[in-house]
Each structure stands twice: as C-alpha cells, then as structure tokens.
Amino acid sequence: MPSFDVVSEVDKHELTNAVDQANRELSTRFDFKGSDAKFELEGYVVTQVASSAFQLKQMLDILRGRLGARGIDVRCLDEESPLENLGGARQKITIKQGIEQAVSKKLIAAIKASKLKVESQINGEKLRITGKKRDDLQAVMQLLRKTEVDLPLQFDNFRD
C-alpha cells in the first residue's frame, strides 16, 4: 500500500550557512560597526548577542532574511524574550524540529474530517499516512498544505 511521512525538519547544514551569512552581513552593516553583535549557533539553538534590545530586533530581521534565502521556513523559529543587563542583550532562538503530539492530532483530525480513505498514525515526531490509492495520498498532501499550522511541513519517504 502506498504511504508517505509528514515531517518538520530543518537541514542543519543550511542552518549553519544561514547563520554564517547573517554574521557576515553584521560585520559589513554600518549600524553595527564597532559593536560586539554576533550570532552563535549551538545545535539547533541560535543565540543573538548585542549591546541593546533594539539591535536584537534588527538582527532578528537579518536572520529571518538569511534563513529565507537559504530555503528555511521562518515558521520553525521559537523566539524567547530578550534578556538585558549592563553588558548587553541576549536572545535565544530555538529551531523547532519534529511535529509535536498536539499538532499531529490536529493534522489527523483534519484528515479524518476530509473523509478520504487513508489511515494516519503518529510515529514519534513523524506522521505516517497510508492509503490504497496514490490519488488519495496526493489529496492528503494538498489538504495538509492548506491546513493552518505554525510549522513548515515536508513530505518524504513516499512509497508505492
């Protein structure tokens, strides 16, 4: 039976490239000359360091632009509130990986409401969709693309 997986993943290599490009842009921008503003990447957490909260907002715009240019959907960003002290300001931005249980249940409910003849099951942070016809699976893909979710969804592991 044909099947496919619904996942929400970010390519680590593209993320590294986007952060490097954002750091390069910071070094060339006039409004950041002489400041110690920078992006640091550890795993899937990007830390912004700047001298003020205002600069953090500008840096976030730079990061979003670079992520978009590298093909990474900015809906995967989970921004914490900025921390300010005398030495400067910091903000952590977590890159969301995988589909949470609540979001998976919402997607499954949308699939069931469409009355398509497919089965869906949760496999950890993935969602496996199985059906008898390829056309049904393609209809589910269209449905999931239209569904309002705050995560970027990708489809992989398509089996016939």
Swiss-Prot record:
Transmembrane segments: none
Keyword check for Nucleotide-binding: yes
Keywords, in A-Z order: Nucleotide-binding
One Pfam family hit: DUF520
GO molecular function, one term: nucleotide binding
One cellular-component annotation, GO: cytosol
Role of this protein: Nucleotide-binding protein.
The family this protein is said to belong to: Belongs to the YajQ family.
This protein's name: Nucleotide-binding protein BAV0791
Organism: Bordetella avium (strain 197N)
